[in-house]
Amino acid sequence: MLKLLKTIMRAGTATVKYPFAPLEVSPGFRGKPDLMPSQCIACGACACACPANALTIQTDDQQNSRTWQLYLGRCIYCGRCEEVCPTRAIQLTNNFELTVTNKADLYTRATFHLQRCSRCERPFAPQKTIALAAELLAQQQNAPQNREMLWAQASVCPECKQRATLINDDTDVLLVAKEQL
């Protein structure tokens, strides 16, 4: 018995003082995903990549908004959302203490405004996504005077662009046909 007591005294404390002392986690620990709405462009890549369907994106045309929502009750902390985010708006934290008394506290939401088409006035994409695309194109072309033109092109929905292209193609085909006669 004394031998066992000596061994225990030499070994020291085997347990940690958690929750009274903070528990250290390893650097690669995958905890609660944290969204930075200021960086998010509401592209939906994270929702497509989430295998547990914990992330959802809902578009409301009536309110002209897109809502990003994370339900921590479904999250498996795989880190796919962090990997696919093009703007690094989602970061996995070291936070693992997710006990709540209210189920609503397990939800994280962010709302983003949608851009309306300059021709048909229907909402079609988040304003931040279009602004980022126009900015990236302007940087590649190194032409600040084209920014307004790029923004004008980016603020037209795909359906209106397609309609305009088809109309122009038909007109061009008719003009070529008349010239051949």
Swiss-Prot record:
Record SUPFAM superfamilies: 4Fe-4S ferredoxins
Q: Where does [4Fe-4S] cluster 2 bind?
A: 75, 78, 81, 85
- For the keyword Glycosyltransferase, the answer is no
Pfam families named among the record's database cross-references: Fer4_7 (PF12838)
The family database entries (InterPro entries) matched by this protein are listed as:
4Fe4S_Fe-S-bd (IPR017896), 4Fe4S_Fe_S_CS (IPR017900), NADH_quinone_OxRdtase_chainI (IPR010226)
State if 4Fe-4S is listed as a keyword.
yes
Supply one GO BP term: aerobic respiration
MF terms from GO for this chain are: 4 iron, 4 sulfur cluster binding; metal ion binding; oxidoreductase activity, acting on NAD(P)H
4Fe-4S ferredoxin-type domain location: 31-60, 66-95
| Residue positions binding [4Fe-4S] cluster 1 | 40, 43, 46, 50
Q: Which GO terms describe its cellular component?
A: membrane
List, alphabetically, the PROSITE patterns matched.
4FE4S_FER_1 (PS00198), 4FE4S_FER_2 (PS51379)
Q: Which domain of life is it from?
A: Bacteria
Q: Which UniProt keyword terms apply here?
A: 4Fe-4S, Electron transport, Iron, Iron-sulfur, Metal-binding, Repeat, Transport
Entry-linked PANTHER family: FORMATE HYDROGENLYASE SUBUNIT 6-RELATED, NADH DEHYDROGENASE UBIQUINONE IRON-SULFUR PROTEIN 8, MITOCHONDRIAL
Q: What does this protein do?
A: Probable electron transfer protein for hydrogenase 4.
Question: What protein am I looking at?
Answer: Hydrogenase-4 component H
Q: Which gene is annotated as encoding this protein in its UniProt record?
A: hyfH
